[in-house]
Amino acid sequence: MTKRQNRMTLVALLVIGVSLTGYLGLKAFNENLLYFFSPTDVTEGKAPKGKSFRLGGMVAKNSVKRDGVKVTFDVTDYVNTFRVNYSGILPDLFKEGQGIITTGSLINGIFIATEVLAKHDESYMPPEVADALEKAKNK
């Protein structure tokens, strides 16, 4: 091979390598995204089936049922309510009427949470939850 052919081969391999690295990086990034949905979005079928996502809203009054570390509660956006099952220790700030965001997946119509995040003080509302509640009110 001539010097020029060697250089062209090297450039072609470099372009292929950079393209492959970019593709794999974007694919990994996309697979790790967790989209936020309100109970209304989940009820309307907008949430992914079999994939992890975030569900946010308010913990419905009189809905928390504890059985050891297993907890069942309802999350509402005041239009629709969705049942959540969680096994684990809840945050100290978790209580009925509080804004929360849960991470998990939908299995047989029940949201199985792997993580529960509660808002940090009385005046704070996670932006996603505030937007979802406002959107639900306007429907």
Swiss-Prot record:
Keywords: Cell inner membrane, Cell membrane, Cytochrome c-type biogenesis, Heme, Iron, Membrane, Metal-binding, Signal-anchor, Transmembrane, Transmembrane helix. This is Cytochrome c-type biogenesis protein CcmE. Residues 1-7 are cytoplasmic. The chain crosses the membrane at residues 8-28. It is a single-pass type II membrane protein. Heme chaperone required for the biogenesis of c-type cytochromes. Transiently binds heme delivered by CcmC and transfers the heme to apo-cytochromes in a process facilitated by CcmF and CcmH. Belongs to the CcmE/CycJ family. One of its GO terms (biological process) is cytochrome complex assembly. It is found in: Cell inner membrane. It comes from Ruthia magnifica subsp. Calyptogena magnifica. The gene is ccmE. Its main location: membrane. InterPro entries: CcmE, CcmE-like_sf, NA-bd_OB-fold. One of its GO terms (molecular function) is heme binding. Heme binds at residues 120, 124. It holds the Pfam family CcmE. One of its GO terms (cellular component) is plasma membrane.
